[in-house]
């Protein structure tokens, strides 16, 4: 018998907003709100010349234009990453399913690579420093991650590993065929990838990190890698993959290179030093 401390999973409706035939699901709403907040927050950072040590290297008009391309990078990269990293055999047999985004299946690591492509392409086309555009993009990203993980929780998906039912906040997820008490790992990840990461980056920005191109980008990559690996210890692996080698999950495997890349970017940003204001506007 399960103890009385076990928390009942809230009975959320799958549709967040419904007006006649028009419906928006929670995950789509998380994407929309995350992108809108990110755009507004990016504009506020760019308006504050003190944070950059002079005029920001990106104009408000440019960041307005960039939103479209980074959104495409997130969606196309996220879906492509899920197809390649998590369920390739299924999609080889059912290629039409690749385009059924409403059925779910997105990968952060794929979305991140899609954003990298969008940043590099847009920066090159508009004469913007790539590292500075990467800094502003990753500075706003944690809010989208927070909302995405909350949407995962509301949808009752990507739940955590089974745990002792005596854990005070253990939950039984309605869609779990085993009906075992589990860690609400979506909320753990929301706290680490969203709240913690946003707070650390915000503090770094206030301390002048945007004056060192690549610093925020490197910190985001490094800290996300650390928090994702930590969260994977509580998250149930995708059923079609299970555990890989030595207890590694796909999420861990894809996050390990982020630790190296993030650390390299931070070291290079420190060695490079803060540019003079005249250099920052090139």
From Swiss-Prot:
TM stretches of this protein: 19-39, 58-78, 104-124, 190-210, 214-234, 250-270
Name of the top EC class for this enzyme: transferase
The protein's annotated pathway: Protein modification; lipoprotein biosynthesis (diacylglyceryl transfer)
Keyword Cell inner membrane: yes
Any GO molecular function: phosphatidylglycerol-prolipoprotein diacylglyceryl transferase activity
Record flagged with keyword Flavoprotein: no
Taxonomy, superkingdom: Bacteria
Listed InterPro entries: Lgt (IPR001640)
Subcellular location: Cell inner membrane
E.C. code: 2.5.1.145
One of the GO biological process terms: lipoprotein biosynthetic process
Protein name in UniProt: Phosphatidylglycerol--prolipoprotein diacylglyceryl transferase
Gene expressing this chain: lgt
């Amino acid at each position: 018998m399960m103890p009385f401390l076990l928390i009942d999973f809230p009975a959320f409706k799958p549709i967040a907003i419904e007006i006649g035939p028009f419906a928006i699901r929670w995950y789509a709403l998380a994407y929309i709100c995350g992108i809108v907040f990110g755009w507004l927050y990016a504009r506020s950072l760019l308006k504050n010349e003190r944070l950059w040590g002079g005029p920001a290297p990106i104009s408000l008009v440019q960041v307005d234009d960039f939103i479209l391309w980074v959104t495409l990078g997130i969606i196309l990269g996220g879906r492509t990453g899920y197809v390649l990293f998590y369920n390739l055999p299924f999609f080889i047999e059912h290629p039409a399913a690749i385009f059924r985004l409403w059925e779910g299946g997105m990968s952060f690591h794929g979305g991140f690579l899609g954003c990298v492509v969008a940043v590099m392409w847009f920066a090159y086309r508009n004469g913007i420093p790539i590292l500075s555009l990467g800094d502003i993009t990753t500075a706003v990203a944690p809010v989208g991650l927070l909302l995405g993980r909350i949407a995962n929780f509301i949808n009752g998906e990507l739940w955590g590993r089974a745990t002792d039912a005596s854990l005070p906040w253990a939950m039984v997820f309605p869609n779990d065929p085993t009906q075992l008490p589990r860690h609400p790992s979506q909320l753990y990840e929301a706290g680490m990838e969203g709240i913690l990461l946003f707070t650390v980056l915000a503090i770094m920005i206030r301390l002048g990190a945007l004056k060192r191109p690549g610093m925020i980008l490197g910190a985001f990559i490094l800290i996300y890698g650390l928090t994702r690996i930590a969260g994977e210890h509580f998250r149930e692996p995708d059923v079609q993959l299970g555990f890989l080698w030595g207890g590694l999950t796909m999420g861990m495997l894809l996050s390990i290179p982020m630790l190296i890349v993030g650390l390299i970017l931070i070291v290079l940003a420190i060695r490079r030093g803060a540019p003079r204001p005249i250099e920052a506007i090139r």
